[in-house]
Amino acid sequence: MRINHLSPSSHKPDYTHRRYSCIPALWPVCLGFEAEENARQNWEHTLNFIGEAYRINHELSPVWTTQNQITLDLDTMYLRDFSTGSQNLPVLLDAPYAGHSATIVDFAPGQSLVKAFLDNGHPQVFVTDWKSATEEMKDFTIDTYLEALNLAIDELGGEVVLVGLCQGGWLSAALAARFPKKVKALVLAGAPIDTQAGNGVIKKLTRDLSMSNYKALVKRGNGRLLGQFMLQAWKGMHPDQQYIEKYIDLFLHLDDPHYVKQTETFARWYEYPLDLPGAFYLQVVQQLFKENLLVRGEFMALGKKINLKAITVPTYLLAGKSDDITPPEQVLAATHLIGTPPSHIAQKIVPGGHIGLFMGHKNIHEVWPEIAKWLSGMTD
């Protein structure tokens, strides 16, 4: 049952009894009044906390900040159009398909990667809004998603600036290597290209756990990797923060509307996971993370073995210094794996972790505008 939040005025106690506190004979009575009032306030605060904690975990869902329309509806995704004008090369943001909504690229006012491109010389922006997998989608493979990405590019005229984020990064790199003429410039941000580089958490998990463990997870989801499984795994990486500290912080800041709004904004995205097709997920674990086939030149994409050296277009590599999901080494390895001349490769390591690469305030207002302008200079 949802607990209704009390209005701020209901938190204001009536202290009229304190006018009598100067009378020694009434001190015990006044202390009793204060104890009762404090108990009532604490109880109301606790009820509000319970209601808000339930709300952020169960009642919120992802929202888009910037006006857009669906221009293509596929089994795997919606292709969303955020354009405010036209340009020679549209920008296609390939959002992560790793258990959370694509709204990370349009997270909140002032924290929108979409807006960063729109406001910095790229009026035509599209986003791959990957769909949560239904049971009917359980047998979809990597090829299914490559085919969808390829179709989206065709829908946009056959040539794009492709921006691959997180798990969308390796998919974008594979697409660019498979169809090099369709990608005129490439950005890889927080993207695991060489999955055996560095000391990331995912590298460790995929190294230490056998495929039977991953298959068991998919079996539990009736052929899918359920988003809730992934969410609990991510939370388990920082249990103190996720299960204790964030609730203490919420309790202490419950009367701060700005804090509550920020908490709800993040919860809309983080606490609303997507399911993945089991076949797709198991292929990613086996072929990309365990066998590192993309780097070895052994990865099959839509019937053809691909080589990252086929990528020769201007490429920007962005990594987070303290990213424990995709350490910088995994991203920057692309420098010597792709065929682009060094003079047309830019790279940057920014302070912070993984998620902040795509929605952190400083990155959105300083780093991504720089990338957008670099792309303009390279593709004009």
Where are each of the predicted segments found?
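Short beta-strand immediately N-terminal to the catalytic nucleophile in serine-hydrolase-like folds
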Residues: 162-164, 189, 318
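Short, surface-exposed "cap/lid" segments of acyl-processing enzymes
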Residues: 56-58, 62-134
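Catalytic histidine-centered segment of alpha/beta-hydrolase-like enzymes
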Residues: 347, 351-366
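Gly/Ala-rich beta-loop-alpha elbow adjacent to hydrolase catalytic centers
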Residues: 163-172
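Alpha/beta-hydrolase active-site loop
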Residues: 137-155
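Alpha/beta-hydrolase-fold enzymes
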Residues: 1-35, 157-158, 171-279
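Short beta-strand/loop motif that positions the catalytic acidic residue
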Residues: 311, 317-319, 323
